[in-house]
Amino acid sequence: MKKILIVDDEANNRLLLEEILEDFKGKGVEIFLAKNGKQALGIIISERPELVFLDIMMPTISGYEVCDIVKRELKLLYIYIVLLTAKGQEEDKHKGFDVLCDRYITKPFYFNEVIEIAEKVLGIKVS
């Protein structure tokens, strides 16, 4: 079973992304939600999702830190991490790619972009 993890400290953002990705559930994809970096790491370690949509600005452990831990410390390079953020400055993007994120999307994002990423990473067509 393929798995997606959505990580954001704002409940509305988590629910919006889950709604955008709802059609994947009908294709056997399990969607997990986390409200902070600590929860995200726990789910990543136990569930090994193929795809993570990860907010950057969160209390305690930032999205940058989560990405760095997943890619460098845990060596889970196969997990496709999309950093989602309102921070659109070039230096912010560079920092994201420095911690080995696979994609960097600024909010507000296009729904189709999120769906296309999930289709590509999971190899499942829903649109």
Residue spans for each PLM region:
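Alpha4 helix (beta4-alpha4-beta5 surface) of REC/receiver domains from two-component response regulators
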Residues: 65, 88-103, 112-119
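A Lys-centered signature of the CheY-like receiver
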Residues: 107
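The feature encodes the CheY-like receiver
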Residues: 59, 68, 77, 89
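Conserved sequence signature across two-component system core domains
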Residues: 7-8, 34, 52
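Active-site beta3 strand of CheY-like receiver
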Residues: 47-53
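Helix N-cap/capping motif at the beta->alpha junctions
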Residues: 33-42, 63
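Two-component/phosphorelay signaling modules centered on CheY-like receiver
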Residues: 11-32
